[in-house]
Amino acid sequence: ATVGHYDLGLINKNKNLIQDLKNHKFDIVYLVGQDNLNFEKKDEFIIYQGSHGDNGAELADIILPGSAYTEQDGYFTNLEGKMQKAYKASYPPGESKEDWLIINEIAEYMNNRKLFNDKDELESSMINYLNLQKEKSYEEKIKENNELNEFHNETLKIKMKDYYFSNVIAKSSKTMIECNNSKLNLKSTGTEG
């Protein structure tokens, strides 16, 4: 997700965003699939948009049922910076909708107009933007946003507490729960290797 955010220019220039959240400096917090924030809610009005409802949904005043990544078409950027299209494996259940549709409907409600008329227009707009960005040299991108310097010089730290429960979808999976239980049973016998 981080590489994709950089590609789209969605970069947090406020280094203290999480600290500001913990210090209750926001009136409204909109979480899109964000389930790993660690903070205590005070007076914030929290809107959660997501598929499986973990920590973010527990804090929410309003829940907008979104689709899991397997239930919506989308684009992903790998660590090489290459964009890849992914197609949905199934349709979202019940009242849940694809993320772009929810955001489009909110925009229509607030501004009396949609951001995009359909998914093709959204994809075309995104690809045109990315093509314009590709024309810029690496040096130009760094000059535009000094945050890139810090990103490229960061040490990658992976805190993997439990592979089988590494995200909200895995935590909800019967198969992953069984895998985790098998791992725990091996540890209790001392035969885990």
What are these regions (language model features)?
Residues 1-138, 189-193:
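Non-catalytic alpha/beta scaffold blocks inside enzyme catalytic domains
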Residues 123-193:
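Long, low-complexity segments enriched in small/aliphatic residues
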